[in-house]
């Protein structure tokens, strides 16, 4: 059946500094960062309300014979409540220079922690079900995220997964082994899962095997199609995997 169990927000690249750089004031920038999660939560809640009220329409769409199978199954109680995941991109996404596929060895872990804490707090104000840290290129940034998540005043106890960008079947983009990263995540209670994204599909199987040797936490996998990315032109090239 078509449908989704998790709705992901569009805040991957959203930061207060980024919006201010586009000319928005501080308060406007803060609200725009939060809006990415707010809209996803709102859409999910409208769907739940329509189901609870037995509504025949959802945001103007008639629920009838042409209704997607996933919606039908949910309406009949066969699917769980959809979750909202707040997409939280890496420092490299803010830089917009492709460094989320290389790492940033000259940037200290403490600086990365300071980068993540305020935007994490803003996302959490909108009460997503889970935080999805994505395309994390390095062990250092994963440590910074783990520290930020360990502060209950920042994370509000919301669980998270960390998904890494990987350069091959055994290493994250900055060169550390996925095993080292998974070992760390296994010990951090607020991080409930580990993932792989923005990675060539042929690397996924060995990465999963490596992760599973050191942790039983859930693994999320959503790799690239198989094309290559040109960070200078910001375009994809090559053939997608079948």
Task: Please describe what each predicted stretch is.
Residues 1-242:
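Domain-level signal for soluble alpha/beta catalytic cores
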């Amino acid at each position: 059946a078509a449908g989704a169990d998790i709705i992901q927000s569009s805040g991957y690249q959203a930061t207060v500094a980024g919006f201010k750089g586009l000319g928005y004031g501080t308060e406007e920038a803060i609200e725009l960062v939060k809006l990415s999660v707010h809209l996803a939560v709102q859409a999910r809640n409208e769907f739940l309300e329509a189901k609870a009220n037995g509504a025949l329409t959802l945001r103007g769409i008639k629920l009838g014979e042409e209704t997607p199978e996933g919606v039908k199954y949910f309406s009949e109680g066969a699917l769980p409540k959809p979750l909202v995941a707040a997409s939280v991109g890496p420092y490299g996404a803010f830089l917009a220079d492709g460094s989320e596929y290389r790492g940033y060895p000259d940037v200290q872990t403490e600086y990365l922690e300071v980068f993540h804490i305020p935007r994490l707090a803003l996302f959490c104000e909108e009460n997503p079900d889970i935080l999805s840290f994505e395309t994390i290129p390095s062990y250092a940034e994963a440590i910074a995220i783990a520290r930020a998540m360990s502060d209950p005043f920042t994370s509000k106890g919301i669980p998270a997964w960390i998904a890494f960008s990987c350069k091959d079947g055994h290493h994250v983009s900055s060169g550390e082994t996925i095993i080292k990263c998974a070992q760390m995540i296994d010990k951090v209670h607020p991080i409930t899962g580990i993932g792989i994204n923005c990675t060539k599909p042929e690397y996924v199987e060995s990465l999963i095997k490596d992760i599973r040797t050191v942790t039983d936490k859930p693994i999320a996998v959503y790799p690239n199609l198989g094309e290559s990315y040109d960070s200078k032109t910001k375009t994809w090239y090559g053939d997608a995997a079948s």
